[in-house]
Regions:
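Conserved beta-ketoacyl condensing-enzyme motif
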Residues: 22-112, 117-136, 191-215, 310-332
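Short, well-ordered amphipathic alpha-helical segments that serve as non-catalytic structural scaffolds
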Residues: 27-43, 68-72, 97, 149-156, ...
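Active-site-proximal alpha-helical scaffold in enzymes
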Residues: 87-118, 157-187, 258-265, 330, ...
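N-terminal extracellular/periplasmic Venus flytrap/periplasmic-binding protein-like
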Residues: 10-13, 24, 28-33, 44, ...
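Glycine-/small-residue-rich "gating" segment that lines the acyl/pantetheine channel
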Residues: 121-158, 220-245, 397
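Active-site pocket-lining segment
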Residues: 55, 152, 190, 196-200, ...
Length: 397
């Protein structure tokens, strides 16, 4: 099989849902903007060489419906011949698209695909079609399949004895690492500024107005966070005996990411500079009511298939859906703290469901290079009870 490379990956800044810079921005518009920038950043890439757009989205309906991947391809500067397909594996949708593109290239059916993910929670949450949403048989037999993600986080905390203190301590670390990374400019290369219009609402009068803004950084993190502040927050999903709070959970946010996946041969032929090799991907199911622990099963499976050990991995990007599941996975598998989410994660910078996996791939590409590492893992839990894991290797020319 052919070598598959990640040539480049860009993303928007992550903006707070409903209150941030993208609260009036369509998902297809922000993604098409990234496609155009990706073409500009890689002048050797002939737009006509791109064969498909595979885009992940956790809620592909409403403003994100109508096969958003095809909409993005048509909105962008790609030729009309470039197709598009939308993928939904909830929080691993962005990683799933990279894996799908990679296997298509690996097999020889394609040479160049744009993958990625997007989520505009601002324009979709509360506006989804709930007609006949619940399958009564499924709900009766496996009720956890319909649990809110926060409920599953509480389940993990209680079932595996993850304390409130451990969750808050991890959340604080995420905030501190993101603040340090932003101060050092470690996210700058992956973020593409975007001019847009946001809606502001006066809290006292309710008056609304639109203002022009430029989203050029992540605005969700709170550098001033303290352990005392986190410990004072009330549980959201189980007010009486719970431990999952707004402070130790991922933040609702809007954003997009696009990743260029190519055969090594075609990339070099065009004079492009790859950043990563794609080395594998796996998905494993688990009980839906504890969906957060999915990577406990998918990580060992992928390492076994790649004939690697835990100590061979130089960088771990584990999506921070909730601190309870991150702490459990970390402690169960023995993930080293100094290699895990080294620049923070979704608790501090936000989690637009469909885009996070693609964002993580782009971040691994840059951080592996900074550290001189070889292997990086991107992994996350998935709604419905799954774990998804991707393996990447730093590119050596």
């Amino acid at each position: 099989m052919r070598n598959v490379v990640i040539v480049d990956s860009v993303r928007t800044g992550l903006a707070k849902s409903f209150r941030g810079g993208f609260n009036q921005t369509r998902a297809d518009n922000m993604t098409a903007h990234l496609v155009d920038v990706l073409l500009e950043r890689n002048p050797g890439l002939d737009p006509a060489a791109v064969e498909d757009m595979i885009l992940g989205c956790g809620a592909p309906e409403g403003a994100q419906g109508h096969n958003i991947a095809r909409n993005v391809a048509v909105l962008s500067k790609l030729p009309i011949e470039v197709g598009g397909t939308t993928v939904n594996r909830y929080c691993s949708s962005g990683l799933q698209t990279v894996a799908m593109a990679a296997t298509q290239v690996q097999s020889g059916f394609s040479d160049c695909i744009m993958a990625g993910g997007v989520e505009s929670i601002s324009t979709t949450q509360g506006n989804t079609n709930m007609h006949m949403y619940v399958n009564d048989t499924l709900a009766a037999e496996v009720p956890g399949i319909y649990h809110a993600m926060g409920q599953t986080a509480e389940c993990v905390a209680k079932r595996y004895n993850v304390t409130r203190e451990a969750q808050d301590e991890y959340a604080l670390s995420s905030q501190q690492r993101t603040a340090a990374a932003q101060e050092a400019g470690l996210y700058d290369d992956e973020i593409v500024p975007m001019d847009t219009v946001m809606k502001l609402v006066n809290k006292e009068t309710g008056a609304e107005k639109e203002v022009e803004v430029t989203v050029d950084k992540d605005d969700c993190n709170r550098p001033e966070t303290t352990l005392e502040g986190l410990s004072s927050l009330k549980p959201v999903f189980d007010p009486e005996g719970g431990s999952v709070t707004a402070g130790n959970s991922s933040q609702l946010s809007d954003g997009a990411s696009v990743t260029l996946v190519m055969s090594e041969e075609k990339a070099l032929e065009m004079g492009l500079k790859p950043k990563l090799y794609f080395r594998g991907f796996t998905v494993v199911g688990c009980q839906p009511d504890e969906m957060g622990i999915g990577p406990v099963y998918s990580i060992p499976k992928l390492l076994k298939s790649a004939d690697l050990k835990m100590e061979d991995i130089d960088l771990w990007e584990l999506n921070e859906a909730f601190a309870s599941q991150v702490v459990h996975i970390r402690d169960t598998l023995g993930l080293p703290t100094d290699k895990l989410n080294v620049n923070g994660g979704s608790i501090s910078i936000g989690h637009p469901f469909g885009m996070t996996g693609s964002r993580q791939v782009g971040h691994v590409a840059r951080e592996l290079n900074r550290r001189g590492g070889k292997y990086g893992i991107v992994t996350m839990c998935v709604g419905g009870g799954m774990g998804a894991t991707g393996l990447f290797e730093a590119y050596q020319s």
